[in-house]
Amino acid sequence: MSDPGFLEVVTTWIALLASYNDHKTIRAIKEVLIMEKELFDYVAERAGVLATADTSKQDTKDAAAAWKDAVAADNSDAAVEVATTKLLDFLEGRPTTIDGVIAFAQGPAKEMMGEEAAAKMLEAQLARKEAGAKYCNCPSCAAASELLAKFGRIEL
């Protein structure tokens, strides 16, 4: 995620701090770098789901692929932040709410999936709503809502 220059600076600082035996500072720097990588991996994993899931609409697949292409072309922190913000802006308002899934199960799902499958879907979604779920749990909606929640744009 960071450019080589950034990593060189961090490595130099770690070496400098190590010479002063400042283990708390070294540990703090390592934790920040690990957290940064974990967040990048979190976004990358969900972008991968959005780009390939059968439940994703084409424009969602395109937005996720654009994120992947952008960070592959320029993995500097600034470029990753811009690409991630663009993806999050696109995703806002897209995950289907639990009420939307329930309405689907009560109506169109009956024709598309049959009465029995729609009834099972409805039962499962009503149970999820009762347990506090706010969004659809299909792979695309789950990935999108997890990303939006991670960046504080929605609450799960």
What is the predicted role of each segment?
Residues 35-69:
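Short terminal alpha-helical segments
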Residues 36, 57, 77, 134-137:
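Amphipathic, non-membrane alpha-helical segments in soluble helical-bundle scaffolds
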Residues 60-112:
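Aromatic-anchored, charged helix-turn/loop surface patch used as a conserved interaction hotspot
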Residues 117-156:
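Amphipathic alpha-helical binding modules
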